[in-house]
């Protein structure tokens, strides 16, 4: 039925999803015991891998936040609390747990659910995303507005270490450091955006000291780094943060592509998948697709650079996506 299982050696199947079958919204998730959550995460990965390899979509980033997403919805109430996913391509598990499980056959298709959080799609999508480094500013604005209305609920931003290098994220951290807003920023540190990260922030996160670091210098409470796939650690840290009403940073370390070995080994290649990639028999070799704009740009720039040594390429933090890797 699913040729990609044979092609990729996929062993997951959806015959028995004892826990996930009974979860239609976060209220069902909250009925589970802590001990049942690891099994639920296994079932979520099986479901997600099956559906996305069949239908296409953002892949490895979502596998890296399964445990985090489950625990967030287990502890907080996002009908009241607020949650913003930076970029948003890692929000598929969030969608799965918030009443959109049956829509995964039509994800990113006409009439189906979007591949990013979308405000008019669900009451659980609090901010429309799709671009990098906007989450902290957005959640801080919501939290400041809530303070004016005397609403004490939690405001959470999940931002990757790659997105943390964007200028808007620094502007937001600058403001957050002097705010009393009820904000939790979760740094999802997986060492990679679409391509491996670089720069001073990347180095700082790799060598960070819990007592003395960039975030504490800004006046922010910091915890971490903790294992973002360890359910007990996540529950402990997030339950503790729930009772704190001032800005906090929680630094977690995750593996992009967690639970699917090909994606763990080739994280850039498995950032997203398409059905043609999954099943080569479906590709139309008689009518090949035209070259992508970025590929034309990358190869043209290379040709020009070979003739003019003064040309320097500046990548937008993703040499693969911009096709500047050819340089």
Q: Where does each model-flagged region fall?
A:
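N-terminal amphipathic, basic-rich helices that act as targeting or association modules
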Residues: 16-97, 216, 225-234, 248-251
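Gly-rich Lys/Arg/Thr-decorated short loops/hinges at beta-loop-alpha junctions or inter-strand turns
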Residues: 19-25, 46-51, 114-126, 155, ...
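Cofactor-pocket helix-loop regions in the catalytic cores of large enzyme subunits
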Residues: 41, 45-48, 57-65, 215, ...
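Cofactor-binding active-site loop characterized by glycine-rich and histidine/acidic residues
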Residues: 58-179, 293, 303-327
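Flexible loop/turn segments at secondary-structure boundaries
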Residues: 91-93, 164-166, 191-195, 222, ...
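Conserved thiamine diphosphate
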Residues: 149-153, 199-237
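Mobile "lid/hinge" segments at catalytic clefts and subdomain interfaces of large enzymes
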Residues: 165, 172, 177-202
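Terminal amphipathic helices with adjacent charged low-complexity linkers/tails
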Residues: 229-284
